[in-house]
Structures are given as structure tokens and as C-alpha cells.
């Protein structure tokens, strides 16, 4: 037998090292497949756990001024929760905030569906990741319809794969996370700057002075004109309510200006008294593209709302004082079975009772 030379020994050692490295990486790859890490190819800088897949929507920038569909979840969270996106802009804001809060409370990962991302991401710097449609369709969901207030059972939901539904928009779900919610619903810079530019141009009509206080006014009209009286035995805010709400602010704030937005701007111009020179009809009333109106409202100091989730969220994000329309249904309304005023309006907000006389007139034989 030929004695091994020093060169042969070195080559043998290198061969053993190469084989060991191949074995190690093969084992690592197999382990990653078992634990779902192969799905991270959709977001190559993130790791996700099977059967969850997240993907970065096309044409989504990754600058600080954008929402991120591929954030990293804390390692302590598990499972997959999502919520069915239903309704319009304010409804989906409520669904997003509720999903985020309940998932955190139960130690679960929260994901939104592409339709919700398409609604909210153009406006806000949201961070919840997006669930791929094929994963949504193949996940063994348990479904749970939420009512619109926090309940004890929602704090102890053991389901690892849960799809929520409903129209939750109650502060009782998420107010303990207020700073996080405000961060999630931070406007993109261009929307905030455009809204502030509009406000900077406003002047008080009589003096020409710049306003000291901006009060956003959201007047919900549209489909509520039929839905409230016919289905819910309720009313929308009328001109008397808006006058009283404005007088409340005039008595408490120096030189306010009222920035009116609505999906019924023509009605507002005809029914809101602007003779004092402190009412500005600034909204464009485009229901399909509500971003500009919403941004305007959130950049004001205070809020007057009538009814609806759009007005709620404008007030919640703006902070300051909020006046809302209170007791806007008859006592026997079916609406009160799904809506609790004490869970809908923050305790410090100020309610002004609605005029229900049109409903009594309708009820007369």
C-alpha cells in the first residue's frame, strides 16, 4: 500500500468538508420546507409560517411613506387570523382596527385580504400583511361574526385559523391601542400635505383673518336618507342639529372655521347657514374616492359628525372635541339591537339629541 502524501491528506480533508457542508444545507432546506419557510420566496426578506403566505402587491413602493404588506410578526404570535372586508371606507377601517386588536389580545398573527389592502393602503401607512388568495381558499377557517362591541368571549378565542366578519367599529375593541391605531392610520404625506394646503388657504369671511381653530364637519346623506327612516326608524342630522353643534364650538373656541364635507354637498350649501363667514364648503363629495374629504377632516382640530363610520373615524383620528348626533332612532328601533351608543361614542364626546319628530309624523295613520 502506497503511503499517503501530505497533498493527498489535504485533498481528503477538503472532500470531507465539502460533503459535510452539502449535508448540512440539505438538512436545513428540508427543515425549512417542513416549517413553511419556503413560502418566504414571496417576500424574500421575511420568514413566514405555513400555511400562511404573504405577498407584496405589484407596484407597491417600499419607501417609509407607504404601507408595508410584508412586515415581520413577533415570534410569540401564532396562527392566522383575518377579517372579511365588507362595506365602504369607514367600515373597513373598523374591521382593520378590530382585527389588529383582537389578534394581539389572543396572541395570533393578523393578515388582511387583498380587497382591504386595496381600499386602505392608498390612504394610510398600514402594516398588516396581505394573505394570498390561494392560502385564503385552502385554509381550514372557523368563521366568527362579530357584534359591534367588545365582549369577554372575544378575549379568549382559541382558534388558530379564524376569519372574522361583521361591521365592528367600536372603540371598546381597540381604544387601549390608541397610539398604535393612530400610527396604522397615518396618512401618506401627499394626502396630509394637500389637506393642510387647503386649510392654510381658508380665511374668515368677515375679517379675512386666518382661522385659529378648524372644525371638520361631516354630514352623512346619500343612502342613509332612505335607510334610516325606512329600515331603522331613525333620522340623519338636519340643519337645526348642525346649527346647534356649530354654536357649541363658537361658544368655546375663538374664531373657528367650519370645514364642511358631505356626500350631499348641494344639500349642505342650501341648508347650512354660512352668513357668519365661518363656514367653508370644502368637500368634493366623491363617495367612490373619499380620501380627500377624509384627509381634510383628520387635519382639523375638532369634529362635528352626524352618523356613520366615516365621521367616527374622522373624529377619532383628529382628536380634540367631538360633537355627535345622539338618540337618532326611536326607542323600539331594531337598530339598537346591533348598535350600542355607549360603545360607539367615546365618553368624552358630546351628544346633541336628534329631532325625531319626522318619524312620529310618518308613524301617524
From Swiss-Prot:
In what pathway does it function?
Protein modification; protein glycosylation
The disulfides recorded in the entry are none
Q: Where are the transmembrane segments?
A: 9-25
Name the principal localization, coarsely classed: Golgi
EC identifiers of the protein: 2.4.1.69, 2.4.1.344
What is an example of a GO molecular function annotated in this UniProt entry? galactoside 2-alpha-L-fucosyltransferase activity
Q: Does the UniProt entry include the keyword Kinase?
A: no
| GO terms under cellular component | Golgi cisterna membrane
Q: Where is the secretion signal located?
A: none
Catalytically driven reaction(s): a beta-D-galactosyl-(1->4)-N-acetyl-beta-D-glucosaminyl derivative + GDP-beta-L-fucose = an alpha-L-Fuc-(1->2)-beta-D-Gal-(1->4)-beta-D-GlcNAc derivative + GDP + H(+); a ganglioside GA1 + GDP-beta-L-fucose = a ganglioside Fuc-GA1 + GDP + H(+); a beta-D-Gal-(1->3)-beta-D-GlcNAc-(1->3)-beta-D-Gal-(1->4)-beta-D-Glc-(1<->1')-Cer(d18:1(4E)) + GDP-beta-L-fucose = alpha-L-fucosyl-(1->2)- beta-D-galactosyl-(1->3)-N-acetyl-beta-D-glucosaminyl-(1->3)-beta-D-galactosyl-(1->4)-beta-D-glucosyl-(1<->1')-N-acylsphing-4-enine + GDP + H(+); a neolactoside nLc4Cer(d18:1(4E)) + GDP-beta-L-fucose = a neolactoside IV(2)-alpha-Fuc-nLc4Cer(d18:1(4E)) + GDP + H(+)
Pfam families, from UniProt? Glyco_transf_11
Domain of life (superkingdom): Eukaryota
> Which keywords are on file for this protein?
Glycoprotein, Glycosyltransferase, Golgi apparatus, Lipid metabolism, Membrane, Signal-anchor, Transferase, Transmembrane, Transmembrane helix
The UniProt entry lists membrane topology as: Single-pass type II membrane protein
Is Transferase one of the keywords UniProt gives this record?
yes
Q: Which GO terms of type biological process are on file?
A: carbohydrate metabolic process; fucosylation; lipid metabolic process; olfactory bulb development; positive regulation of cell-matrix adhesion; positive regulation of endothelial cell migration; positive regulation of endothelial cell-matrix adhesion via fibronectin; positive regulation of sprouting angiogenesis
Record localization: Golgi apparatus, Golgi stack membrane
Cytoplasmic compartment: which residues? 1-8
Residue ranges in the Lumenal topological domain are: 26-365
Residues bearing attached sugar chains per UniProt: 65, 301, 327
What family is reported?
Belongs to the glycosyltransferase 11 family.
Instruction: Please describe what this protein does.
Output: Catalyzes the transfer of L-fucose, from a guanosine diphosphate-beta-L-fucose, to the terminal galactose residue of glycoconjugates through an alpha(1,2) linkage leading to H antigen synthesis that is an intermediate substrate in the synthesis of ABO blood group antigens. H antigen is essential for maturation of the glomerular layer of the main olfactory bulb, in cell migration and early cell-cell contacts during tumor associated angiogenesis. Preferentially fucosylates soluble lactose and to a lesser extent fucosylates glycolipids gangliosides GA1 and GM1a.
What is the designated name of this protein? Galactoside alpha-(1,2)-fucosyltransferase 1
